[in-house]
């Protein structure tokens, strides 16, 4: 029987006609001479009725064999349900199909969990039986949304003159940052390919090639410890443009993101997006990816603290640190136990403690430190944080990086507790002017904040070549880089690139590469720059993360068809797995475990 309509797409126009539907049995109910089957496909479900008086005894006996998740083809007459039988909870709840023919296309074992959205089952079971998990409507909605996003991306870039160009999956290992996944070469014994962490160099070479506008929805690989928003293999929306400056890239990406929201969600997002410098973001929010759906900004009270009688505050400022606070509105009634919990929370970010002022509704004040302050000092601190009766003011005193990390995380924690991070609300932000370099204490050298091909900020270019520059001077150099942040999550990052060999050589030098090392790893790129490279820049968006946020999910595993676990394993296929000794011999390698 050939399908004539999808289960979720029956309409009034088809009432009275014979239709054929295919799908899986969601539920079967036996009422004596009537059998009701809810048949499901990816569009929804529809009720099928087997009435022994209408369909005959033979067909009815066949319907009695049907169980959950059987795959069926059903032909019948579409009718309206009686008013008392209407189900208002599903789009097709006014209709039912009175069965005339049935074909069991495939029987099914009893599944290890119910195929339904409100599922309470361990994720390891879901991943082991992923093909069953993906039958659930919410998982199918996630993948349909992912398709809509990628279609909107491709349509947009095609309309704006971009070429979708594939770059190699087997490439050269240039370890800088995360570990590479290595692939041994059978025909070149002792040598290895690497799976790409990013197509960065190849897309820059596309610009040197004169292709001008490149885009690729590309798989990337990083051998790193996983989190809720990380996978060993992931997908990027990768973009590069020639003859552009920063604002050209940002404007184009704003249009693309707005198009995705419009086409995939039916949501209009205002452009241009807000911009903050890295320094502003860290000072005001304690994070380079702040969630701007709520305020609760960090307020600096270091100048008041410097002259106060509270030794913790005064000592921190004298040691080159700072004192900052946030106002948790309406939390003035927090108990000492609750405040102690917050103190333990900030200690996980290396803060030594948490000071507080609780302003009671009746004007009373509870505090861990105001007894050491004058009334004027206390009043000034409360004024700066815009404290009102019922508020809880929370303070951290330490070095700037610790204050930012601890208070920034506490701000998000309090935002969650107070319900300020509203789902369904989207706040987009560009963070610009990142540092170009950061000092790595373990390796005793500078590393690139983004990557080695990021161009310095035009205003700081002369500082890159300054003879005898101190570590502090080099750390203060800004990058011509930018990140797009959505609801406190980094959605993508990019930069204007270096396109001249002398500057790229200098960048490698600052990162501790000898000329020989730079030539061995990146000689082909350096040589390409000598044949006329245009100014260029680009960006890469994490597609998995983007779809996760649009879908309102907490993990990218929910928007990837077949994801890995937190230990980078595939529970369904049992990958990674051991291989036969013969395979290792052919590759000229052996394991040591």
UniProtKB/Swiss-Prot annotation:
GO cellular component annotations of the record: cytoplasm
GO biological process, one term: aspartyl-tRNA aminoacylation
Keywords noted in UniProt: Aminoacyl-tRNA synthetase, ATP-binding, Cytoplasm, Ligase, Nucleotide-binding, Protein biosynthesis
Enzyme Commission numbers on file: 6.1.1.23
SUPFAM superfamilies, per database record: Class II aaRS and biotin synthetases, GAD domain-like, Nucleic acid-binding proteins
UniProt-annotated stretches for the region Aspartate: 200-203
Stated role: Aspartyl-tRNA synthetase with relaxed tRNA specificity since it is able to aspartylate not only its cognate tRNA(Asp) but also tRNA(Asn). Reaction proceeds in two steps: L-aspartate is first activated by ATP to form Asp-AMP and then transferred to the acceptor end of tRNA(Asp/Asn).
Protein name, entry field: Aspartate--tRNA(Asp/Asn) ligase
Organism listed in the record: Symbiobacterium thermophilum (strain DSM 24528 / JCM 14929 / IAM 14863 / T)
Lineage: Bacteria, Bacillati, Bacillota, Clostridia, Eubacteriales
């Amino acid at each position: 029987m050939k399908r004539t309509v999808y289960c979720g797409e029956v309409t009034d126009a088809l009432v009275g006609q014979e239709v054929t539907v295919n799908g899986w049995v969601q539920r079967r109910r036996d009422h004596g001479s009537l059998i009701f089957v809810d048949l499901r496909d990816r569009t929804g479900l529809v009720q099928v009725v087997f009435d022994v008086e209408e369909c005959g005894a033979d067909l009815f006996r066949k319907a009695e064999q049907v169980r959950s998740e059987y795959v069926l083809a059903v032909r019948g007459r579409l009718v309206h349900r009686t008013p008392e039988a209407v189900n208002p909870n599903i789009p097709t709840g006014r209709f039912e199909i009175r069965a005339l023919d049935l074909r069991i296309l495939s029987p099914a074992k009893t599944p290890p969990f119910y195929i339904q959205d409100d599922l309470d089952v361990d994720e390891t079971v879901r991943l082991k039986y992923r093909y069953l998990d993906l039958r659930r409507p919410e998982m199918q909605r996630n993948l349909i949304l992912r398709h809509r996003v990628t279609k909107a991306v491709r349509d947009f870039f095609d309309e704006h003159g971009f070429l979708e160009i594939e770059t190699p999956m087997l490439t050269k290992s240039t370890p800088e940052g995360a570990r590479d996944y290595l692939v041994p070469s059978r025909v070149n014994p002792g040598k290895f390919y690497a799976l790409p962490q990013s197509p960065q160099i190849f897309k820059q070479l596309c610009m040197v090639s004169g292709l001008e506008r490149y885009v690729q929805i590309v798989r990337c690989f990083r051998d790193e410890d996983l989190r809720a928003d990380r996978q060993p293999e992931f997908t990027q929306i990768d973009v590069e443009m020639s003859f552009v400056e920063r604002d050209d890239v940002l404007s184009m990406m704003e249009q693309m993101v707005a198009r995705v929201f419009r086409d995939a969600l039916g949501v209009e997002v205002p452009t241009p997006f807000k911009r903050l410098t890295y320094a502003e973001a860290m000072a005001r929010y304690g994070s380079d990816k702040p969630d701007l759906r709520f305020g609760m900004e960090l307020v600096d009270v270091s100048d008041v603290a410097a002259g106060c009688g509270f030794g913790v505050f005064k000592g921190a400022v004298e040691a080159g640190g700072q004192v900052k606070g946030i106002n948790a509105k309406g939390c003035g009634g927090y108990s000492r136990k609750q405040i102690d919990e917050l103190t333990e929370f900030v200690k996980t970010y290396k803060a030594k403690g948490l000071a507080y002022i609780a302003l009671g509704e009746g004007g009373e004040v509870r505090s861990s430190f105001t007894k050491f302050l004058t009334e004027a000092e206390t009043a000034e601190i409360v004024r700066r944080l815009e404290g009102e009766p019922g508020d809880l003011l929370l303070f951290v005193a330490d070095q700037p990086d610790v204050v930012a990390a601890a208070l920034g995380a506490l701000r998000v924690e309090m935002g969650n507790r107070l319900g300020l991070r509203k789902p369904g609300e989207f706040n987009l932000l560009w963070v610009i002017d990142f540092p170009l370099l950061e000092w790595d204490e373990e390796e005793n050298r500078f590393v690139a904040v983004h990557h080695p091909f990021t161009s310095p900020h035009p205003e700081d270019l002369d500082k890159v070549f300054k003879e005898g520059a101190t570590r502090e001077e080099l750390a203060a150099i800004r990058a011509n880089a930018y990140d797009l942040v959505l609801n406190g999550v980094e959605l993508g990052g990019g930069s204007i690139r270096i396109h001249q060999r002398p500057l790229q050589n200098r960048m490698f030098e600052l990162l501790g590469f000898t000329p020989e090392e730079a030539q061995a790893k990146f000689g082909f790129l350096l040589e390409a720059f000598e044949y006329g490279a245009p100014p260029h820049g680009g960006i890469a968006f994490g597609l998995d993360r983007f779809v996760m946020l649009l879908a309102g999910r907490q993990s990218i595993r929910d928007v990837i068809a077949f994801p890995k676990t937190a230990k980078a394993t595939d529970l369904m296929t049992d990958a990674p797995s051991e291989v036969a000794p013969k395979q290792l011999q052919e590759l000229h390698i052996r394991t040591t475990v």
